Amino acid sequence: QEQTREFQKENETLKIQRFENTFFNMLSQFQEVVNNISYSYQDKEIDKIVSIRGREAFYVSFEMAPRRPGISSWNPEYENRPYQGMSEVISVLGKEVYMDAFTPSYFDHYFRLLYRILKFVKTSPLIAEFDAEYEYTSMLRAILSRYELVWIYYNGLSEYGEEKLQPLLERYAM
């Protein structure tokens, strides 16, 4: 009986190690995706194309990069006006415009991988308790910058994320 108990304990340890190996590999891949994000835009003040990489792309594209929403259903007065970053587009036109306002496709892979990590934690049979799920997703949340969280928030509210991503974001208080 003692031997059976030891075997079960060892088996549980191996399951957790297998889960953690996959989870931390996914986090590593996520970090690689973040580091490889690149974004370029024309800065009219210095008359130069500015290229941004990594986490800085989240900040620049939200606060600084010029945007033209191109939303035909909106008031034409706003249609062709340049905006200073997605934050200004949202503050002038509302969060509903996120989908139409040139949502950056260079974040697509980022959002898909984020979703896969959260879904992996939620659906893994190797983790039985919510507290353990929450602990792992807290590790993920800890590596996200403020502007990543802002983009994740709006993506979760959009038609891209409302059905699948948003429930996971709420579940893990992200």
Please report, for each region that a protein language model flagged, where it lies by residue.
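Intrinsically disordered, low-complexity polar regions and short flexible loop motifs
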Residues: 12-174
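Membrane-aqueous junction of the first/signal-anchor transmembrane helix
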Residues: 1-15
